Amino acid sequence: MKAFSPVRSVRKNSLSDHSLGISRSKTPVDDPMSLLYNMNDCYSKLKELVPSIPQNKKVSKMEILQHVIDYILDLQIALDSHPTIVSLHHQRPGQNQASRTPLTTLNTDISILSLQASEFPSELMSNDSKALCG
């Protein structure tokens, strides 16, 4: 026997949401199976992209990750041994050498810019800027 409450649910349905058939997207916590399928899709895509992974053989997720790491390291070695890059490394000591900015720095900069942009009054933004921001 199921227990039930005579009190109605407090959740409101917006008329516009109901009439347009718009539903809220679930978070991964709400639907762990969708997260699992999404991760499996990502592993399948990695398997397609990395040339050293045999396509006709079943490989574990761990093997896929190992192949991906090896492939990234191989690409880094190939990039570092490219003649243009090698010539940059052999510059005179007084010259600036090109260095790669860590992604964490770039992500932090983007977050700061996003926060600053959200503080501007909307009337000061041009129509082009509004289209880009929202």
Swiss-Prot record:
Modification Phosphoserine, positions: S14, S25
Keywords: Biological rhythms, Cytoplasm, Developmental protein, Nucleus, Phosphoprotein, Repressor, Transcription, Transcription regulation, Ubl conjugation
Tissue expr: Highly expressed in early fetal tissues, including those of the central nervous system.
Pfam families referenced in this protein's UniProt entry, alphabetically: HLH
SMART domains per record: HLH
Biological process, per Gene Ontology: adipose tissue development; adult locomotory behavior; astrocyte differentiation; B cell differentiation; bundle of His development; cell maturation; cell morphogenesis involved in neuron differentiation; cellular response to lithium ion
Organism superkingdom: Eukaryota
Self-association and partners: Interacts with GATA4 and NKX2-5. Interacts with NR0B2. Interacts with CLOCK and BMAL1. Interacts with IFI204. Interacts with NEDD9/HEF1. Interacts with ASB4; this interaction promotes ID2 proteasomal degradation.
Name listed for the protein in its UniProt record: DNA-binding protein inhibitor ID-2
Organism: Homo sapiens (Human)
Taxonomic path: Eukaryota, Metazoa, Chordata, Craniata, Vertebrata
Gene: ID2
